[in-house]
């Protein structure tokens, strides 16, 4: 039930040189206005008054969460250093963390490939699978290396800045109306585009750089994707 102002005050109060961005975690959750620090009657009253509130996952204390990544092998997290992520926002909309788990479950996803920027969130997702649907139903995960631009993770702004496409085909931002030209409009053939993508973060252990689609299918191995 914390207001944005109360959350900001908490961050300012707990901010230190070694911890510049304090998190909402086990060390401070009982100091905030939530169902752990309030009685059930107090919580129910706030809900009945339509007090804006979010729903968070309560991370367990001192528990090691592990899963096997198809690229990185065994990955483990200490839940003591993971914050209590918001699952439902004050407007009732789910965050990515809840939505992706429910969506994968409903669509019966067996293998999930995503960028390595989501690796720090994997502990939350493993626990959500365990709590909601059973860990045994969780898809196999592969956290892929990111495609980088000159200054870090590739963004659509890099295309305009450095003069190269970042999308397979022209893409229009629904909010801003900004149009970003794609590889197809630049005249790149699909076979060349697929070949280029395949070589970003993977090779077959040889010096070969040009592959037909059939060759890629035959020679590709997830074990040879770069970590």
Write out the residue ranges for each language-model feature:
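Active-site cores that bind ATP or allylic diphosphates and position pyrophosphate for catalysis
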Residues: 2-161, 165-166, 179, 204
């Amino acid at each position: 039930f914390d207001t944005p102002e109360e959350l900001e005050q908490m961050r300012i109060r707990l901010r230190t040189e070694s911890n510049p961005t304090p998190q909402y975690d086990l060390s401070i959750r009982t100091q905030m206005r939530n169902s752990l620090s309030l009685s059930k009657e107090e919580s129910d009253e706030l809900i009945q008054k339509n007090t804006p509130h979010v729903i968070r996952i309560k991370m367990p204390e001192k528990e090691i969460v592990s899963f096997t990544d198809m690229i990185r092998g065994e990955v483990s997290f200490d839940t003591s250093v993971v914050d209590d992520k918001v699952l439902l926002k004050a407007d009732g909309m789910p965050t990515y963390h809840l939505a992706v788990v429910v969506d994968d479950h409903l669509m019966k996803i067996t293998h999930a490939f995503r960028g390595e920027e989501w690796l720090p969130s994997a502990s939350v997702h493993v626990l959500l699978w365990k709590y909601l649907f059973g860990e045994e139903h969780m898809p196999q995960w592969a956290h892929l290396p990111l495609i980088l631009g000159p200054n870090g993770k590739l963004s659509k702004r890099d295309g305009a800045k450095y003069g190269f496409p970042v999308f397979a085909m022209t893409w229009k931002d629904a909010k801003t109306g900004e149009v970003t030209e794609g590889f197809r409009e630049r005249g790149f053939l699909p076979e060349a585009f697929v070949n280029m993508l395949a070589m970003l973060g993977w090779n077959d252990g040889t010096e070969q750089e040009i592959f037909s689609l059939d060759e890629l299918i035959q020679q590709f191995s997830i074990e040879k994707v770069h970590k």
